[in-house]
C-alpha cells in the first residue's frame, strides 16, 4: 500500500520536473530557440491557438528564427502576437514568412531572465514539496488505519524524503544550467 503511494508520488514529481523543464525552456536566452515561442497564442479565426500549431518554427542561424505559417492569411495575426509577447523581439513579415532576429541581451535583461528562471525553478520545487506533503499525509493515514505497520511507515517516509531530494536536485540542476546559459556572453 505504501509502495503504491510512493510510486504515485514519484510519477507526480517526475511530471513536476518536466513542467519545470518546459517552463525554463520558455525563458529567453541570447540564442534563438523554437521553444521560446511555445507560450505565444494567436487569435485564429476568433479562437486562441498556440503559434506552434499554426506554423513551422525553425532556427537557420544562432540569432534568427523563421516562422512559416500553414495559412499565409494569418501572417499579420502571428506577427502581432509575437510583437505583443514579452519576448522583446521585433518580427518582420515578408508576405510568406516571419523572420525574428534575436537581439543581443543587455546585462540588465540577462539578470532579469536569471531572476525569472530562478522563480520558475522555485515554483517547481514548491510543487514537488506539495506532492511530498500529500504523499506523507497518505502514508500517515495508511499507518493510522492499521493497513501498514509503524516500521513500514517510517521506511516509506525515508524513501519519500530521498525522492523529494532527488527531484528537487534535478530542478536545481536545470535552473543552474539555464543560469549558466543566460550569463554566457
Curated annotation (Swiss-Prot):
Keywords (alphabetical) are: Cytoplasm, Protein biosynthesis
**UniProt key word Protein biosynthesis:** yes
Cellular localization per UniProt: Cytoplasm
InterPro entries found in the cross-reference section = Ribosome_recyc_fac, Ribosome_recyc_fac_dom, RRF_sf
Which Gene Ontology molecular-function terms are recorded?
A: ribosomal large subunit binding
Question: What does the UniProt function comment say about this protein?
Answer: Responsible for the release of ribosomes from messenger RNA at the termination of protein biosynthesis. May increase the efficiency of translation by recycling ribosomes from one round of translation to another.
Which protein are we looking at? Ribosome-recycling factor
Organism field: Saccharopolyspora erythraea (strain ATCC 11635 / DSM 40517 / JCM 4748 / NBRC 13426 / NCIMB 8594 / NRRL 2338)
User: Where does it mainly reside?
Assistant: cytoplasm
Keyword hit for Magnesium: no
In terms of Gene3D superfamilies, this protein maps to: 3.30.1360.40, Ribosome-recycling factor
Family per record: Belongs to the RRF family.
Read off the SUPFAM superfamilies from this record: Ribosome recycling factor, RRF (SSF55194)
User: What PANTHER family does the annotation carry?
Assistant: MITOCHONDRIAL RIBOSOME RECYCLING FACTOR PSEUDO 1, RIBOSOME RECYCLING FACTOR
Provide the organism lineage as a comma list. Answer: Bacteria, Bacillati, Actinomycetota, Actinomycetes, Pseudonocardiales
Q: Name one GO cellular component term.
A: cytoplasm
Q: Please indicate which superkingdom the organism of origin belongs to.
A: Bacteria
**Which HAMAP family does the record cross-reference, listed alphabetically?**
RRF (MF_00040)
